[in-house]
């Protein structure tokens, strides 16, 4: 079966046997009920994974090869900006990488995509070790 690149779809994993060898990810967020900018960042990261050709988003931590744990707090009264701590941990509990991000609601899409690339590079480095 030949796939035209424009018709290729992102990996989806309701059945992990369909995509053997695909890297599965889960995003777990910890933020307050009113922290809308933090929530928007977590959703943007989940969306970036769902659109990715290299990764598959899963909802069950037991099915995840890596977990992205995001702790965030909105830093202004309008809930337009958030300070976020992102930690990537392997299924074996090994710390892969950690970074801190300031994100505004206006640029969460770009930040989610950029951080997915950052995480991909960190995972590739960890696999070479």
What are these regions (language model features)?
Residues 51-56, 64-110:
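Surface-exposed short loop/turn segments
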Residues 9-10, 54:
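Residue-level marker of positions within ordered structural domains that often coincide
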Residues 10-21, 45, 91-129:
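C-terminal/domain-edge helix-coil "capping" segments
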Residues 20-69:
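N-terminal segment of the mature soluble domain
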Residues 7, 22, 30-33, 60, ...:
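Intrinsically disordered, low-complexity regions
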Residues 13-21, 59-63, 76-80:
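Short, surface-exposed loop and linker segments with low hydrophobicity and enrichment for Pro/Ser/Thr
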Residues 3-5:
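N-terminal signal peptide c-region/cleavage motif recognized by signal peptidases
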């Amino acid at each position: 079966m030949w796939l035209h690149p424009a018709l290729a779809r992102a990996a989806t994993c309701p059945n992990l046997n369909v995509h053997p060898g695909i890297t599965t990810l889960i995003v777990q967020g910890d933020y307050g009920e009113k922290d809308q900018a933090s929530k928007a960042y977590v959703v943007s990261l989940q969306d970036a994974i769902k659109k990715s050709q290299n990764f598959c988003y899963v909802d069950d931590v037991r099915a995840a090869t890596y977990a992205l744990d995001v702790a965030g707090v909105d830093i202004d009264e309008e809930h337009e900006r958030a300070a976020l701590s992102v930690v990537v941990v392997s299924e074996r509990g090994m710390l892969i990488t950690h970074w801190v991000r300031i994100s505004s609601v206006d640029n969460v899409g770009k930040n989610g995509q950029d951080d997915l690339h950052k995480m991909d590079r960190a995972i590739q480095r960890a696999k070479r070790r």
